Amino acid sequence: MLRSTLSNWREYLTPVTHQSTFENTGQITPEEFIKAGDYLCHMFPTWRWNQQQGGMVYRDFLPQDRQFLVTRKVPSNMRAADSVNVGGEEETSAGEYWVLQPQQESADGGEEIDIDEMLQEMDIEDQSGEQDIIQLRPSHTRFYDLYITYSTSYRVPKMYLVGFNNDGTPLTPQQMFQDIAPDYRTKTATIEKLPFFKSAVVAVSIHPCRHANVMRVLMEKVRAAKQKPVEEEQPDGPREDWEDLQDEVDSSLRVDQYLVVFLKFITSVTPGIEHDYTMEGW
């Protein structure tokens, strides 16, 4: 918790800057954070801004209804260690401390539902003359409330995770760490209290120290790809994730698209949590 306390003091003492350096550094201003948050909420309605209410700690450089973004009850059906190298695909490095993991298909991604597998999750007892009794086996599914706020010390978004068992009981920090990729549990994950609530809500935060560098590297790759002649034939072979992103933007990454890309990288740290990160919002 000492690291968390020092981080909070650094956030408090660091002055806020309003000069945009997005294209050169990958950092954003509070105004750009708001613009990116509005875009995220518009394209992905599961995300929304906070509501003004009692019991909150407000930061004066952000509007009271734009303090943080939240999405609730995001499912996690497998632990992080179980989802590493799914399908034997090779990991792609994207800067120090960041790895792009293979993406899981969403429920509406065209994958067929295995009815037999669903039935195996249930024990059905048929008792004649009595109502059928369906007993559900314990589920390994967990749910997360995800929060995104603005880090003044790193000038990038910062993610907080608050987890629950399938019966609604809160997860312990140790349990939440099971949903952090093993390589990052000691590098980027920290136990903290949510800074925007007066009451103590224990969360796991994803440290933002590398966020700006990852975004900057991504933007450089997009720019380099755009400078190549359009008619140049693409080489055969596997494509990197950043190349897929490059195909979906017009000329370069816009600042309002920042959080969509941010969530795509967060999946490297929390591969088992089913973020609403698809690129349909581009």
UniProtKB/Swiss-Prot annotation:
Pfam families: Autophagy_act_C (PF03987)
UniProt key word Transcription regulation: no
Self-association state and partner proteins as the record states: Monomer. Interacts with ATG8 through an intermediate thioester bond through the C-terminal Gly of ATG8. Also interacts with the 40 amino acid C-terminal region of the E1-like ATG7 enzyme. Also interacts with the ATG12-ATG5 conjugate.
Biological role: E2 conjugating enzyme required for the cytoplasm to vacuole transport (Cvt) and autophagy. Required for selective autophagic degradation of the nucleus (nucleophagy) as well as for mitophagy which contributes to regulate mitochondrial quantity and quality by eliminating the mitochondria to a basal level to fulfill cellular energy requirements and preventing excess ROS production. Responsible for the E2-like covalent binding of phosphatidylethanolamine to the C-terminal Gly of ATG8.
Location of region: Flexible region: 83-138
Organism from which the protein derives: Eremothecium gossypii (strain ATCC 10895 / CBS 109.51 / FGSC 9923 / NRRL Y-1056)
Gene expressing this chain: ATG3
Handle region: annotated span: 213-257
One Gene Ontology cellular component: phagophore
Cellular localization per UniProt: Cytoplasm
Keywords: Autophagy, Cytoplasm, Protein transport, Transport, Ubl conjugation pathway
Name of the protein this chain belongs to: Autophagy-related protein 3
Keyword Cytoplasm: yes
Chief location bin: cytoplasm
Domain notes: The N-terminal region is involved in phosphatidylethanolamine-binding and is required for ATG8-PE conjugation. The flexible region (FR) is required for ATG7-binding.
Gene Ontology BP term (one): nucleophagy
Active site: 209 (glycyl thioester intermediate)
Annotated segments matching region Disordered: 225-245
A GO molecular function held by the record: Atg8-family conjugating enzyme activity
Family in the record: Belongs to the ATG3 family.
Feature: compositional bias, Basic and acidic residues: 225-240
